[in-house]
Every structure is written in C-alpha cells, then in structure tokens.
C-alpha cells in the first residue's frame, strides 16, 4: 500500500506542470486520480459532480465551508437518502457566511472540532471509495480568487484511511444543534 501511494505521488508530480498549464482536470493513465487547480479550474464543479453520484455515504471535514453550491449538493444528497455527516473547524461556529448552520438546519449531522488550534482538513469521502482532498477550501474565494489544488482519488484503501481519521475527529467534536 505504501509503495502504491509513493508511486501515485511520483506520477502526480510528473503531470502537475502539464495540468497547471492547461488548468483542466487530468486523469492519470495508471491511476484513477483527477487533478484540478483554481482559480476557475472547476474544483467546485468536480466536487458537486462527485456528490451528485453518491449512493450511500458522504463524510466531510472542512476548515472553511462557505460554498452555497457545495452545501446545496450535500443537502440534495441527504434528501436522496445518502447519509451525510460534516465535521468543521471551530471558526465555522461564528463565521458570517458559514454553511454550518444551514447544514444543521437541514438535519445533516454537523459537528464542530474544537480540539485543535485549527482543524485545517479539506476532505470529502464518498461511498467508501472516493476521496476528495487538497488545499481547496469549500468557498467561493477558493474557486474564483485563490491559487488552490484539488485531487479526486478513487481508492477504497485510501477512503478507509480517511474514514478512520474522520471518525477520530468526529469522536472529539461537539454536535451543532439546528437553529430552527
């Protein structure tokens, strides 16, 4: 497993410069990994597309979550019967445009991770086989203004590792109650 991850990372490094020049998604021939860059590189669209295909479970960890389109996609998945859970950094409890309250109000289990100086994760795990991660915060600024990156990785092994990490953070987080 460790060797597979190292080889995958080396391949990613080899194609990063080409992907950056095109600012488009790149599917690597030896792995099912897509690479996106922002600004305006389709990161939000890739996330929404993956969420829309979810069948059973979506686990989200986020530092900054103000993206209305991503929040809406999670709510739509929840309404389709997909189990959705979200763990957010403590800053999202008071952030002006946070999606935290919206998600909690829509009956999506939402938790605040206050155990760390910053819970700086940007992770979505879908159906125990897809991992979305990178520097990309789930925000409009990340899509339109910031230089960010996003990986969409198809790997049950990696999804299991990230799911265990999600559960560890959820276990020390506080549930966010709906406001209405």
Regions found by a protein language model. Name each.
Residues 26-42:
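Boundary/entry segment of secreted carbohydrate-active catalytic domains
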Residues 8-15:
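Bacterial N-terminal signal peptides
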Residues 24, 131-180:
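Signature of lipid phosphatidyltransferase scaffolds
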Residues 34-36, 59-61, 85-89, 111-112, ...:
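Structural recognition of the beta-strand scaffold that forms the well-ordered cores
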Residues 19-23:
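Boundary at the C-terminal end of the N-terminal hydrophobic targeting segment
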Residues 47-108:
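Primarily the HKD phosphodiesterase
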């Amino acid at each position: 497993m460790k060797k597979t991850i190292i080889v995958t990372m080396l391949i990613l490094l080899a194609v990063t410069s080409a992907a950056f020049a095109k600012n488009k998604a790149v599917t690597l021939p030896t792995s099912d990994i897509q690479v996106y860059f922002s600004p305006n590189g389709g990161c939000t669209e890739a996330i929404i597309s993956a969420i829309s295909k979810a069948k059973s479970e979506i686990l989200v960890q986020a530092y900054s979550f103000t993206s209305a389109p991503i929040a809406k996609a999670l709510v739509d998945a929840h309404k389709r019967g997909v189990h959705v859970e979200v763990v957010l950094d403590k800053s999202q409890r008071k952030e002006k445009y946070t999606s935290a309250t919206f998600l909690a109000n829509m009956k999506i289990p939402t938790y605040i991770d206050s155990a760390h100086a910053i819970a700086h994760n940007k992770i979505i795990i879908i159906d125990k086989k897809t991992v979305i991660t990178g520097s990309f915060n789930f925000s409009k600024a990340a899509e339109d203004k910031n230089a960010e990156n996003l990986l969409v990785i198809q790997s049950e092994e990696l999804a299991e590792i990230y799911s265990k990490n999600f559960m560890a953070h959820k276990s020390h987080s506080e549930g966010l109650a709906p406001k209405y």
